[in-house]
Amino acid sequence: TVEGEVMPMAQELGLGVTPWCPLRGGVLTGKYTRENRDKIEPGRGDRVKDYLTESTFGIIDELSQIADAHETSPAAIALAWVQGRAGVDSTIIGARTIQQLESNLSALRVELETDEIEALDEASKPTLSFPIPFLEMAHNLMHAGATVDGVPSESPVLLPKSDEERY
């Protein structure tokens, strides 16, 4: 995935990334809600139906709540969040109308608070595919509770906690 492989690689190598389709084809604009999910018009709406999962609605809810606090659109919040990500140099927007363009450009005036960024990070945290989850726990498996180079590790739950448990 981009989140699991490309972004970490780009950050490690000092490369900039330009995310494409940061509003997921309009899904993150606030246009689609749980209440209207069954009333989406055919045509353009057909291509977004598969993205309208409970997880996505959680992101939309968070974007809408933050947008209300900033008196702006969910799209502006989503774009401000993406643009503030480490390693992101620019974003590609896909506005079809002047109103959408103005909404997207208003993201340049948004300054998100730390707690808002953390909430969006948590709401949009991707499920990474193998081997990422395995690699994330490798440090703990290798060092089994020891501190190495000043970095502490946790003892995996499968390992014995004492000599009595070993034998």
Name the predicted role of every residue range.
Residues 2-39, 73:
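Aromatic-lined glycan-binding groove of carbohydrate-active enzymes
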Residues 24-25, 84, 97-98:
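Short, solvent-exposed loop/turn segments at secondary-structure junctions
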Residues 77:
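Glycine/threonine-rich phosphate-binding loop and adjacent beta-strand/alpha-helix elements that clamp
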Residues 27, 100-103:
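Phosphate- and divalent-cation-binding pockets in alpha/beta enzyme and binding domains
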Residues 12, 38-69, 84-88, 102-167:
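Terminal-tail/helix-coil boundary detector
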Residues 89-100:
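Glycine-rich phosphate-binding active-site loops on the catalytic face of alpha/beta enzymes
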